[in-house]
């Protein structure tokens, strides 16, 4: 990897050395010499057969967005809609805010089904067990706009563009100075940010730099009255935790509450430890983005973008607990023999505090050459890195050492306290400094060259084409384990690499156009694209796409497309990054294979935990058809409607080996030891050969008859998702004497959302997946002279809950309705303190609505479905010089 990085940086330096300074010249503040179009590689044409949604720089100001991820949260097609993305929560391996269109999720692949780009270039992955790019690595103030295409795009961009493509478009140039910031707060919460952009344009180019610092505080679950971790199977609801203070003592299957330092007969001590845990982590972030453009010659342009982000998140994991620690008979009583669980009572490490640090940087030098006859070469080099690190006090402490402490009397598991002796205090210090540590570093070197231009002319217009090639080298390195503070280097790193070589082409054919239009066909354009990607770890995949735009009249478009896309398995989820282990446990403990019910004296060998072996790409077929209208009879009105369907197969998932139906649901995830096909030593050795601890089960390898089955609990290509729905929007703007009034509605209605854990498992629909049919955003507002005012109603629809033991007292989740207000005041003054100033006020969740009640755990949330900070007010000011 080092050779690739050195070579890449050397190339970038060589390009930069060819740039010469020129005399400064006054130019407009922002110019766009060439509009970058997302969804196609052909200049001058919009993506055929698809809807392109754009969030402009002005929209960013109106939203009061501090994070780029907040921009997507305003779109009903994104999973963050009517929600707020959050990262760095305690113990989480998900350390980024990744875009997620069509609610497809990343599954267990460690990558994302929505592709994130910066000026059409991939961002590095960032995470510990995933390599999704982070939207918030790029500050909103540095963006010209954000393009969103909620449609399969692998034929153009390659991997991960299944649910769609999000392209962050940076400023082309900037002249002057802009400074600003925001300050806002909610109950028990505050946040603020400051930003500055400075730049200069000159006769042959421009240079600019944008910096942003933001900070927000921490919210505990106890700061919000709707979040709890309760046992919802009984009434009244009680705390779901048994690790309490005082705790509990378990002997066999009987739980004894601990009272006055001893176990007694009675109902267990229960508690809700979530109230002292993080609901929203504290975070501080530095972001930097710089741009440089220079015309090397009349036909050759050099472009350079560089970015850096550093983010620190702080979390409180709540009370630290011990579990499964044996209690000596002198402590527990001679009649009892068992284990104790409770909360440490020593304040030095009574809580599990954690920190997550993420850093990312990238350098993108680019050359654009005009080759004549309207042909262009666009070539870039992309060198980037994402680094995530997380450390936290380990839940349960150093269990083997703690068990020894309990046995020798330095730790009392019935009270959670260490002895006051020197030995007891030394034992406490060891536990207080015992941390879990995990890190992931994703490094990419990526280069691409695209030729595009006209081939020939038809009566309908010029047939244009684009073709080219791309190469990427990626390396991922992970550390994951427990160690004392200052000794994290003792955790062995694991690295894995891949190379990707790609070739692609695209064609746009205007069959009817301005010169040959006829009645009923004002224009008709067909496009075709295809891309072949060859991965060094799993081979090749080809993804085509065909699209059509038909305009019966100039203001009415009918469009459609069909294509294939894929999501590559993340390097972070492979066995190379996470070496698998093997576990031996008694057969029948989770249930037996109905065909072979005799489990007596047998043992199951399970590959778990660890990364997947021989993972293949997750593949999708996508198609959509829609229509757009801008009727001249109703000036200011525009509307669109799209039907889409996605068949997403071969999805990466982890088999549920703990289910009694495992042998029925996952027939490809085990090998039975049967009289007709007995396992051999060689088979067992081959099956568990990749496990780092294979030597620990040698007794079963040498005695195959004792093995009931070989089971694979690692990530595999098993699952599928089929979803369909309607996207719609209607917008109207009407000029008035005082400015204008406007109103709009946008939403998505999910018709189907069917998942299967395996090809043979039961199909789970919308309700079983906790997916609402409707997500809707309605706006109304006005431009009154210098004042812009808008009210937004965001609605996430309710859904039914399948009857289970965990939610026996609830049959449906109610809708979630939130009202937001936005005001922007832009004085027209051309001189004085108000010249170039903009003031904003945002009030989110005006009526302080809580998310709807939910009787159980929903995606890690207990007692509620959704997320809100509560009523949140924020003031902002920006000044241009």
Where are these regions (language model features)?
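N-terminal periplasmic accessory domains that precede
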Residues: 68-71, 97-102, 117, 134-136, ...
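N-terminal periplasmic "start-of-domain" segments of outer-membrane beta-barrel proteins
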Residues: 33-69, 93
């Amino acid at each position: 990897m080092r050779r690739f990085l050195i070579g890449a940086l050397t190339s970038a330096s060589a390009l930069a050395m060819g740039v010469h300074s020129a005399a400064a010249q006054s130019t407009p503040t922002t110019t766009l010499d060439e509009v970058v179009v997302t969804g196609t590689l052909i200049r001058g044409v919009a993506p055929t057969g698809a809807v392109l949604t754009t969030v402009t720089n002005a929209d960013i100001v109106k939203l009061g967005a501090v994070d780029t991820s907040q921009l997507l949260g305003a779109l009903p097609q994104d999973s963050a809609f009517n929600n707020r993305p959050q990262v760095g929560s305690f113990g989480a391996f998900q350390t980024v805010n990744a875009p997620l269109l069509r609610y497809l999720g990343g599954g267990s692949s460690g990558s994302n089904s929505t592709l994130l780009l910066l000026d059409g270039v991939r961002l590095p992955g960032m995470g510990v067990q995933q390599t999704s790019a982070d939207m918030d690595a790029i500050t909103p103030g540095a963006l010209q706009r954000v393009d969103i295409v909620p449609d399969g795009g692998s034929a153009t961009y390659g991997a991960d563009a299944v649910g769609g493509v999000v392209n962050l478009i940076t400023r082309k140039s900037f002249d002057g100075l802009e400074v600003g910031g925001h300050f806002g707060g909610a109950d028990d919460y505050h946040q603020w940010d400051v930003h500055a952009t400075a730049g200069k344009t000159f006769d042959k180019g421009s240079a600019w730099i944008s910096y942003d610092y933001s900070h927000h505080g921490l919210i505990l679950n106890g700061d919000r009255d709707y979040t709890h971790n309760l046992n919802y199977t009984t009434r009244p609801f009680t705390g779901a935790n048994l690790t309490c203070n005082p705790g509990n003592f378990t002997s066999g299957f009987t739980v004894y509450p601990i009272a006055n330092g001893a176990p007694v007969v009675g109902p267990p001590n229960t508690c809700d430890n979530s109230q002292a845990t993080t609901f929203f982590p504290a975070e501080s972030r530095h972001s930097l983005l710089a741009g440089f453009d220079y015309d090397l010659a009349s036909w050759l342009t050099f472009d350079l973008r560089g970015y850096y982000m550093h983010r620190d998140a702080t979390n409180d994991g709540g009370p630290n607990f011990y579990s499964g620690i044996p209690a000596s008979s002198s402590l527990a009583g001679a009649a009892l023999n068992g284990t104790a669980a409770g909360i440490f009572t020593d304040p030095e490490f009574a809580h599990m505090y954690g920190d997550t640090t993420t850093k990312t940087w990238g350098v993108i030098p680019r050359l654009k050459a005009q080759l004549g006859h309207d042909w262009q070469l666009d070539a870039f080099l992309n060198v980037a890195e994402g680094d995530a690190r997380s450390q936290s006090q380990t839940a349960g402490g150093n269990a083997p050492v703690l068990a020894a402490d309990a046995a020798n009397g330095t730790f009392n598991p019935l009270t959670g306290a260490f002895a006051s002796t020197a030995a007891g205090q030394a034992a406490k210090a060891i536990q207080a400094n015992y941390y879990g540590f995990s890190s992931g570093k994703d490094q990419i070197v990526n280069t691409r060259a695209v030729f595009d231009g006209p081939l020939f002319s038809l009566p309908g217009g010029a047939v244009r084409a684009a073709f080219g090639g791309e190469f990427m080298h990626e390396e991922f390195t992970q550390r994951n384990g427990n160690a004392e503070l200052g000794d994290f280097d003792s955790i062995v790193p694991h690295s894995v690499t891949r190379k990707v070589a790609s070739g692609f082409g695209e064609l746009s054919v205007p069959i009817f156009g301005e010169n040959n239009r006829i009645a009923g066909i004002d224009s008709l354009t067909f496009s075709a694209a295809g891309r072949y990607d060859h991965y060094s770890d799993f081979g090749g995949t080809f993804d085509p796409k065909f699209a059509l735009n038909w305009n019966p009249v100039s203001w009415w478009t009918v469009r459609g497309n069909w294509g294939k896309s894929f999501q590559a398995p993340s390097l972070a989820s492979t066995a190379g990054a996470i070496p698998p282990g093997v576990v031996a446990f008694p057969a029948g403990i989770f249930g037996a294979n109905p065909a072979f019910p005799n489990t007596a004296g047998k043992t199951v060998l399970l590959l778990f935990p660890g990364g997947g072996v021989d993972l293949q790409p997750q593949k999708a077929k996508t198609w959509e058809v829609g229509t757009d209208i801008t009727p001249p009879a109703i000036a200011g009105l525009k509307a669109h409607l799209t039907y889409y369907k996605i068949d997403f197969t071969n999805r990466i998932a982890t088999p549920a080996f703990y289910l009694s139906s495992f042998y029925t649901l996952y027939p490809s995830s085990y090998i039975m030891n049967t009289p007709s096909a007995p396992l051999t030593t060689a088979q067992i050795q081959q099956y568990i050969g990749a496990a780092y601890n294979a030597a620990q089960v040698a007794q079963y390898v040498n005695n195959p008859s004792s093995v009931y089955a070989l089971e694979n609990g690692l990530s595999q290509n098993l699952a599928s998702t089929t979803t369909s729905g309607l996207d719609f929007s209607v917008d109207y703007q009407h000029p008035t004497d005082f400015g204008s009034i406007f109103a709009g509605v946008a939403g998505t209605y999910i018709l189907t959302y069917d998942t299967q854990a395996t090809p043979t498992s039961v199909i789970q629909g919308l309700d079983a997946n906790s997916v609402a049919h409707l997500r809707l955003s309605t706006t109304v507002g006005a431009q009154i002279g210098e004042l812009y005012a808008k009210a937004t109603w965001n609605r996430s629809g309710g859904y039914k809950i399948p009857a289970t033991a965990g939610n026996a007292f609830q049959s449906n989740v109610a809708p979630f309705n939130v009202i937001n207000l936005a005001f922007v005041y832009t004085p027209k003054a051309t001189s004085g303190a108000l010249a170039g100033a903009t003031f904003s006020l945002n009030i989110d969740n005006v009526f302080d609505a809580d998310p709807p009640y939910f009787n159980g755990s929903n995606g890690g949330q207990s007692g509620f479905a959704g997320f809100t900070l509560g009523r949140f007010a924020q003031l902002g000011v920006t000044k241009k010089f």
